[in-house]
Regions:
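Generic structural signal of hydrophobic/aromatic residues within well-ordered alpha-helices
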Residues: 34, 38, 95, 146, ...
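Intrinsically disordered, serine/threonine- and proline-rich low-complexity regions
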Residues: 14-18, 52, 236
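Accessory, usually C-terminal, subdomains that scaffold auxiliary metal cofactors
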Residues: 157-206
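Eukaryote-skewed repeat-based solenoidal scaffolds used as protein-protein interaction platforms
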Residues: 30, 34-175
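Non-membrane alpha-helical segments in proteins
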Residues: 7-23, 59-68
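Short coil/turn connectors between adjacent alpha-helices in alpha-solenoid helical repeat scaffolds
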Residues: 22-29, 74-83, 216-222
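Eukaryotic acidic, Ser/Thr-rich intrinsically disordered low-complexity regions
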Residues: 190-236
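Long, low-complexity, highly charged intrinsically disordered regions
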Residues: 1-10, 14, 25, 29, ...
Length: 236
């Protein structure tokens, strides 16, 4: 799943797995096998201190797990509720912790193609918070994860990772998993000291994410006045 040759990884291995899940080409038993193997291999933890080639396994494992959760959540899917409660919870926990230790900032690599660990980790968070079996009482934990990501990343996102992280918020709002009142309250609690250059980079990432939330909800005519004002006030 993390083959270093992007033509093989993107054009053959991953696309085959993703298509088989999304288009329900696997039998239920084959889907079960993929789930068991994904959990057993713990790809999100693979050489987590390393960047470069090792990141490919972590990053594309995140995309695979996102596809598995998406299929498990869809009522019209052959694999609807195919995950056991234990498997589902394991995927939730692994996905929520992944971007709290990932350190590879690479977007596109001339050597490996798209690495995009933070974008893929964000895609996994979207599937977690939007999954109907993810406890609604835990959505605040996902917001806390986002806050921790913004406060630990000491570089400026340049490959739309901040926009992918925005999907975690606006997709949860559009799917009625997260109230805009809760998002607004979370925004007012955020504190960026803005005392050095790293602080400004972190604030800039968060602000870019929130602007994307604003634009996407406004486009859907779903942006509340409360959240509109909270985002507008999120400035230096």
């Amino acid at each position: 799943i993390g083959h270093p040759d992007y033509k093989i990884r993107d054009g053959l291995i991953f696309v085959t797995l993703a298509r088989a899940i999304q288009e329900q080409l696997f039998t239920k038993e084959q889907f079960d096998f993929v789930v068991v193997e994904a959990l057993k291999r713990q790809g999100l933890l693979y050489k987590k201190e390393e960047v470069g080639q090792a990141t490919l396994i972590r990053s594309f494992t995140a995309l695979l797990l996102a596809n598995l959760l998406n299929a498990d959540a869809k009522k019209n899917s052959l694999y609807f509720k195919r995950l056991s409660s234990h498997q589902r919870m394991a995927l939730f926990e692994q996905g929520m912790s992944y971007l709290l230790y990932e350190n590879d900032r690479t977007g596109y690599s001339e050597e490996y193609g798209w690495v995009h660990a933070f974008a893929h980790g964000a895609d996994l968070l979207v599937e977690i918070i939007c999954h109907p079996d993810f406890p609604i009482t835990r959505v605040n934990e996902v917001l806390q994860v986002l806050e921790k990501i913004f406060k630990r990343v000491d570089w400026r996102f340049i490959s739309d990772e901040d926009w992918r992280l925005a999907r975690v918020i606006y997709q949860a709002v559009l799917n009625e998993r997260l109230s805009q009142t809760r998002v607004a309250a979370w925004l007012t609690s955020l504190d960026f000291p803005l005392e050095n250059s790293t602080d400004f980079l972190q604030f800039s990432n968060a602000r870019s994410c929130l602007l994307e939330v604003y634009l996407q909800l406004d486009k859907e005519k779903a942006l509340s006045d409360e959240l509109r004002e909270a985002i507008q006030l999120f400035s230096y």
